Amino acid sequence: MNIHEYQAKEILRKYGVPTSTGLVVTKTEKINETIDKLNTEVYVVKAQIHAGGRGKAGGVKVVKSKEEAKKVAHDMFGINLVTHQTGPQGQKVNRLYIESGCDILKEYYFSIVFDRSASCITFIASTEGGIDIEAVAEKTPDKIIKFSVDPATGLQDFHMRGIAYELGFKDNQAKQMKEIVKSVYNAFIETDATQIEINPLIVNSDGNLLALDAKITFDDNGLFRHPNITAMRDHDEEDPLETRAANAGLSYVKMDGNIGCMVNGAGLAMATMDIIKLYGASPANFLDVGGGADRERVKEALKIILSDKEVQGILVNIFGGIMRCDIIAEGIIAAAKDIGIKVPLVVRLAGTNVEKGEEILSNSGLAIIPAHDLADAANKIVEAIR
């Protein structure tokens, strides 16, 4: 789960991370009133969307008067902001965060993430923070600093000293950086986050370190332990089909292809998407119905897939372990009769009650294309949509 910048800063401040402060606006009619509450020489108007690249896309504006701030805010509120992370459709700006500006002497990059390949927590930092951090990582990777933390031992003093040293901080600034490292680590662990990113982390004119922007991503599996964080969820920022799927107990991620996939198990789903690509097409989604799906969940899964107007065909690939193939077959037939599946449908079943499932499908009278293995299934669905 992602949250907005202003929410991320609120959490970080609770853990002792110094951040820039401001006021959030969620209604157009509140813009002028909110800006009037700020007494500053420089105003920073920031679009609040769950995507990076706002600065380059015009979603962050710095102005020097209340009148300018009000005009910029009114112009920005409600627009579709297109960044390199939103895709061409953009993301509607339903919230603004208006801050007091500050002098910036130097920008840094600082984050903490799960390094799945190394099975540890990793700090990533750079002396080259700001809007071009992606270019820095690509063109000058030597400027990216990494420190790994063993989960068994946790954060140690040498991690904090090392990060401060590598970033070039000395004396009081080194002390501040060590405290920020510790605070961010504690926030990461205690909130079940998967990423906390501060970009930029700045040194202001007073020589103090300040988080000027912040992003936090949480592990969905840990949200039940954090109702206060769950309450921060902004459904307007999420794909409506993904939200609908989550409410039905399905793992769904929309993609850019034209072949809908319904699979049980994340690994099998990934393999299914890979083989679709191998045969010359592209998957329209990742959809894992899980090991304990019933007839209604299968039916809802197919409805969600067909809600995507880009879908030209569907591949169902089920390995029946806990899941029974006859249940899948009944769900497919129920969905087909309820909503009408007008695109080619290829079904590959294997495992528990596979013979019964195949019999149910063959006797249904529906135009379902059976497949004997994964390669056969991929070949048939790709050929069917051509």
From Swiss-Prot:
Pathway: Carbohydrate metabolism; tricarboxylic acid cycle; succinate from succinyl-CoA (ligase route): step 1/1. One of its GO terms (biological process) is tricarboxylic acid cycle. Its cofactor is Mg(2+). One of its GO terms (cellular component) is succinate-CoA ligase complex. It catalyses: succinate + ATP + CoA = succinyl-CoA + ADP + phosphate; GTP + succinate + CoA = succinyl-CoA + GDP + phosphate. Residues 9-244 form the ATP-grasp domain. Binds 1 Mg(2+) ion per subunit. ATP binds at K46, G53, R54, G55, E99, C102, E107. Substrate binds at N264, G321, I322, M323. The keyword ATP-binding applies. Mg(2+) binds at N199, D213. Its EC number is 6.2.1.5. Gene3D superfamilies: ATP-grasp fold, A domain (3.30.1490.20), ATP-grasp fold, B domain (3.30.470.20), Succinyl-CoA synthetase domains (3.40.50.261). Keywords: ATP-binding, Ligase, Magnesium, Metal-binding, Nucleotide-binding, Tricarboxylic acid cycle. PROSITE patterns: ATP_GRASP, SUCCINYL_COA_LIG_3. GO terms for molecular function: ATP binding; magnesium ion binding; succinate-CoA ligase (ADP-forming) activity; succinate-CoA ligase (GDP-forming) activity. Belongs to the succinate/malate CoA ligase beta subunit family. Succinyl-CoA synthetase functions in the citric acid cycle (TCA), coupling the hydrolysis of succinyl-CoA to the synthesis of either ATP or GTP and thus represents the only step of substrate-level phosphorylation in the TCA. The beta subunit provides nucleotide specificity of the enzyme and binds the substrate succinate, while the binding sites for coenzyme A and phosphate are found in the alpha subunit. HAMAP family: Succ_CoA_beta (MF_00558). Heterotetramer of two alpha and two beta subunits. NCBIfam families: PRK00696.1, sucCoAbeta. PANTHER family: SUCCINATE--COA LIGASE [GDP-FORMING] SUBUNIT BETA, MITOCHONDRIAL, SUCCINYL-COA SYNTHETASE BETA CHAIN. This is Succinate--CoA ligase [ADP-forming] subunit beta. It comes from Rickettsia conorii (strain ATCC VR-613 / Malish 7). The lineage of its organism: Bacteria, Pseudomonadati, Pseudomonadota, Alphaproteobacteria, Rickettsiales.
